Structures are given as structure tokens and as C-alpha cells.
Amino acid sequence: MTSVLIIENDRDSGPGRLLDWLDERGITPAVVRAWDGEPVPASVDGYAALILLGGGMLPDEDERSPWLPAERALLRAAHGRVPVLGICLGAQLLAHTFGGEVQGKYGQPEKGVTSLTVLPAAKDDVLLAGLPSTVLAVESHQDQITRLPDDAVLLMSSERCPNQMLRIGQSWGVQFHPEVEADRVRGWNPERLRSLGFDPDAVVADAERHAAELDKTWSAVVGRFLSLVG
């Protein structure tokens, strides 16, 4: 049976809707909870794709998150061999590992439903071809990619974060969270949201109001990624 390796970097950043989309296609998730001490594999042998999830650390905060060197090594081993999807921290790991730059608490934070601009390069991308010029996604970050690797293609941007989605070969990184549903947004700490300048009630209401549109968009995009798995 086809299996996809998923690295979980934070107890609060689980795979969410990814598990449903995998199940719909008969693909088995192999989730490694690196934050809980589970060892990160040295290779993608036996796996058809690699997905790296989010987390509150920077991609090189090795003292805080001692599994990160192994995760970066795994990413290098997987790149060019199997399709890779990096989400939030996962996208930052992709950029950092291949020569880009990531800065902590850079610019203005993004939380909740956010409008993204789909850039011209996306029209030829196997995951994004046919999308409208703007789409909505759930965001939850303060850190961001400030310089792309030289061979990266920029696919999406937002007002507060220019580097929202990149591709290097068959490795994609998204700063946003396609896997997050309104249920998870409801669980976000309201005081934390207020401290970042957001109205917690408005953030939840937006996630609920746009739930169907978000699911339609990202189930299709992630579905295209999973169609590469084989």
C-alpha cells in the first residue's frame, strides 16, 4: 500500500484535513511526532512522498528543536526523489535548506483567513493551474521567508508576506495552512490573537464563513499533489 511520510513538528500543528484527503485516495499516512521524541527517518525509502508540517520554531533553531538537523537531512534526501510538500515551518525549512533566508517575527503577522495573489508562474504549475487570480487560505505565522533559493519559483504572495508559496522542482512550500479547518481556528488562544492585533471573534467568524470555499480550493490543490504519489 502507498504510504506518505508526515513529520509533525508541534503538538498543535497536526495533519488535520490531510488525513481525510489521504484516506480518500487509499494512501496510508506515516506520522512521525518529532516534537514528542519520535526519531526522524534518515531517508524516504518505502515512502511515496514527504510532508513537513508547521511549528513555532525557526528552521535552524536546533537547540530549541533538536530534531531539526535530521529533518533538514531528510528533506535533502527526499528532494528530487519523491514529491515534497512543506507547510508553514515546512516551507521555511525548504527555503532555508536550499539556500534561502527565513527571519523570525518579520513584518506583520498573519492570522486567520487571508487573501492570496496567484502569480503568473502558477498557470503552468501542476498543483495550481486553473486557479483564479486570488484565493483564500488560513494563515498562522509571524516568521517568514525573506529570500527565496536561487532556483525557486514564486507562485503566490499576500499583502503582508510576499513569499507565500514556492516550488523547487517537485518540492512545494506553502506559508499558509491548507490542512486547517474552522474547528482548529476556534481553539486558537484569544489572548494571543489580541496581542497580535486580531479580533478573536472575527478570526473565527471568517474561518466559519469561508469554510466551504477553503475546503474546495485546498482539497483540489492537495489532491493534485497526492496524484503525483505513486
PLM segments and residue spans:
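Acyltransferase
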Residues: 180-230
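Extreme N-terminal starter segment of soluble prokaryotic enzymes
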Residues: 1-5
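Flexible gly/pro-rich beta->alpha loop and the following alpha-helix that scaffold active-site loops
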Residues: 19-85
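Short N-terminal binding/cap micro-motifs at the start of the first secondary-structure element
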Residues: 12-17
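Catalytic nucleophile loop
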Residues: 78-101
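Conserved catalytic-core motifs of eukaryotic protein kinase domains, centered on the activation segment
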Residues: 61-64, 96, 106
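Cofactor-binding loop segments of dinucleotide-utilizing enzymes, especially the Rossmann-like FAD-
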Residues: 7-9, 34, 89
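Pocket-forming structural segment of enzyme catalytic cores
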Residues: 98-183
